[in-house]
């Protein structure tokens, strides 16, 4: 089989598992190959097990999420609000219980989900520091975020567990943000950012319907 055909077949398998993930269904070799319209044995020519294809599929989804966030949030003002919206989006992205279960069993991918959003967040924070109209944001706020994000990362796995228990994304997000004032804003400003980020996300979702 030539290289181009192999790549096409592998892409069909990955597309199939991504479709299954998107629908909140449980992936199996049988369901993946059936969705891809390929023979059962074809799967094992490209992937040694379900973990391997899940790993690659999640990798693709994470990359696309990072690109989408950078594109979709660039016009949100002020810049710190983008960081809040990003956390909401990353939590909501994994609300499917099968994917959440897999991620909790493979914490390396949780690390990846966290790390992929950080370069964007850091650029937005730098923008906020240099924004002369955003007088409430200082280097001290930025430094606080750099310190507290380790706590956020640690709490991210807990957030996924709460989703697995059936808790709504908005409630999981609100609890996380309430526990960690990410920029050490005054309480009323922090709450305003939480409310505005939820409103933005919900409006963006409704526009997709």
Named regions from a protein language model:
Residues 22-52, 56:
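Helix-turn-helix
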Residues 56, 70-96:
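Hydrophobic alpha-helical connector segments
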Residues 109-158:
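Amphipathic alpha-helical packing segments from all-alpha helical-bundle domains
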Residues 130, 165-209:
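C-terminal peripheral helix-coil segments that are non-catalytic and often amphipathic
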């Amino acid at each position: 089989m030539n290289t181009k055909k192999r790549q096409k077949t592998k892409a069909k398998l990955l597309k199939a598992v991504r479709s299954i993930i998107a629908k909140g269904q449980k992936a199996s070799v049988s369901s993946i190959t059936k969705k891809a319209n390929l023979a059962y044995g074809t799967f094992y020519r490209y992937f040694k097990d379900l973990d391997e294809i899940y790993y690659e599929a999640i990798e693709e989804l994470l990359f696309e999420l990072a690109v989408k966030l950078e594109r979709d949030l660039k016009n949100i003002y002020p810049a710190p609000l983008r960081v809040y919206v990003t956390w909401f989006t990353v939590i909501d992205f994994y609300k499917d219980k099968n994917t959440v279960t897999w991620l909790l069993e493979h914490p390396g991918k949780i690390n990846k989900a966290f790390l992929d959003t950080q370069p964007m967040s850091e650029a937005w924070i730098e923008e906020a520091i240099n924004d002369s109209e955003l007088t409430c944001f200082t280097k001290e706020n930025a430094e606080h975020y750099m310190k507290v994000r380790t706590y956020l990362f640690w709490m991210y796995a807990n957030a996924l567990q709460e989703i697995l228990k059936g808790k709504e994304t908005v409630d999981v997000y609100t609890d996380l943000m309430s526990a960690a004032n990410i920029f050490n804003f005054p309480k009323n400003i922090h709450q305003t950012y939480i409310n505005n980020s939820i409103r933005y996300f919900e409006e963006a979702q409704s526009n997709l319907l």
